[in-house]
Amino acid sequence: MTPTLVFDIETVPDVAGYRALENVPAEVSDEEVAEMAFHHRRAQTGSDFMPLHLQRVVAISCVLRAGDSWKVWSVGSLEDGEAQLIQRFYDGIEKFTPTIVSWNGGGFDLPVLHYRGLIHGVTASRYWDLGEGDYADSREFKWNNYISRYHTRHTDLMDLLAMYQPRASAPLDALAKLCGFPGKLGMDGSAVWGAYCAGKLGEIRDYCETDVVNTYLVYLKFQKMRGKLNPEAYTREVALVRDTLTAMSEAHWREYLAAWPA
């Protein structure tokens, strides 16, 4: 069975990058630089959402279903820098050649990882294989790779369920809850910068982990819908997630399970 890797990232404004591009003096604080960037962006677009190349990755969380095991974790440690996080993510793809699954990964997560990985000089040979690589199965990647929108090595659930129409897309939180799963708890993407400024990187990683579990559970329901899991197999897979989380002691999993009806 091909391993499945579900992933999600959390980002903050790349203050250092914006400072360098706009020649902001060193004496201006990071918080002030961020406010300048937000103001500039609002004037341009009406939103303070930063362009993807100026989104600095502070957390990458994953669910890996491989063999008999299921695990959820955040890549690296609290002390790891952006380059280390991104390299570790691509190293996981190098190791497992998994099917990767995301929610809006094609529209946000992967382009951010492309830009930021390029800036930091990371290596991602397996990920970028389009059929001309040196791997034994590289020829297969000409027809099914991680990059092409309509291939299956990367399943962007949001994009696929919306039939590749941005106006038809649904929010993960709402869809997860409608499917009977907990959805978001206590934080969303708009709160990440404030939490980061308050030194709450651990809480950001916890939030990212719950989001990636929501994505995985919705993916299981999708696999049942498309006939890849029969009802019994679907029930077993959902039970594996619940049982694994029940055995974990962290507070965010206790909160998550409390919001998940039996």
What does each model-identified segment do?
Residues V12, A43, L201, A247-E250, ...:
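Generic detection of intrinsically disordered/low-complexity segments and helix-coil linkers/edges
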Residues M1-G92:
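Conserved RNase H-like, two-metal-ion catalytic cores of nucleic-acid enzymes
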Residues E22, E31-G46, C208, F222, ...:
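Charged, low-complexity, helix-prone segments enriched in Lys/Glu/Asp/Gln
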Residues T2-P3, Q55-V58, C62-E79, D91-D206, ...:
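Metal-dependent phosphoesterase core characteristic of DEDDh/y 3'-5' exonuclease domains
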Residues V241-A262:
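Acidic catalytic cores of enzymes that act on phosphate-bearing nucleotides/polynucleotides
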